[in-house]
Amino acid sequence: MSLYATQDEKKQAAAKAALKHLPKGGILGVGTGSTVNFLIELLPELQLEAAVASSEATAKRLKELGIEVVDMNHVGGLDAYVDGADEIDRHMHMIKGGGAALTREKIVASIAKKFVCIVDDSKWVEQLGRDFPLPVEVIPMARSAVARKLVSLGGDPVYREGVVTDNGNVILDVYNLNILNALELEKTINDIPGVVTNGIFALNAASIAIVATNNGIEERTAV
C-alpha cells in the first residue's frame, strides 16, 4: 500500500524533501515543470535573495510569490539548481525537455555547484530513452536537416507541432534511440549543425535525486 494516494502527492512530497538540500538566502536556480511547481510554492520558506528562472513560466510563478527573478548575466554562480526530470537513471543522467525548456535549464544548471533533482519513482529508469523520447531544440530552418541526421543515429524524430521555445526555436522528439552512452550521445547530437541542445543531461548530471516512492522519500546519488 502506498503512502501517497496520487502521483501529485508524490511530487509534493519530493518537493518538500528537497528543501533541506537547498541553501537559505542567496540566489537559487529554479527549473521548470509540474514537480518544480510544487516546490516553488514552498520557496518563500527559504527567504531567498532572488532566483534565476529556467523559463518564462517559472519566472512568472516566482514573481507571483514575491520572489525576485534576476537575469543570469548578473550572477557569477549559483549554490544550487533544483529541477525535475522526465527520466533519470542510476548514473544521475537525465532526459529533460518535456516542457520545452531544456536549453535554459541546461544553461542555468551549468553554473550551479549542486543539481538537486526532484522526481517521483515513475521517472526512475534502467536506461534512458526507452519510454520517453529525447527532445532536441532546433533552429527552425535546420529542422529537416537535423531530423535526417537523427535518423542516421538510429532515432525516429517527430516534430512537436505548435510548440515554440522561449528562444524562438522548435522541438524534435526523438524516439527509439539506444542511449547506452549518454555522455557520448549528448555530445554527438549537440555537434549537429542547427541543434541548440538536446535533452540528455549527462555533462550536467544531478548531484542528488530526491525520489518519492510508494514507501516514502529516498535520496539517491550516482552509482
Swiss-Prot record:
A Gene Ontology term for the protein's cellular component: cytosol
Binding, substrate: 32-35, 83-86, 96-99, 123
Keyword Ubl conjugation attached: no
Recorded metabolic or biological pathway in which this protein acts: Carbohydrate degradation; pentose phosphate pathway; D-ribose 5-phosphate from D-ribulose 5-phosphate (non-oxidative stage): step 1/1
Sample GO molecular function, one term: ribose-5-phosphate isomerase activity
Keyword Isomerase carried by entry: yes
SUBUNIT field: Homodimer.
Protein family membership: Belongs to the ribose 5-phosphate isomerase family.
HAMAP family per UniProt: Rib_5P_isom_A
Function (record text): Catalyzes the reversible conversion of ribose-5-phosphate to ribulose 5-phosphate.
Protein name, UniProt field: Ribose-5-phosphate isomerase A
Gene name tied to this protein: rpiA
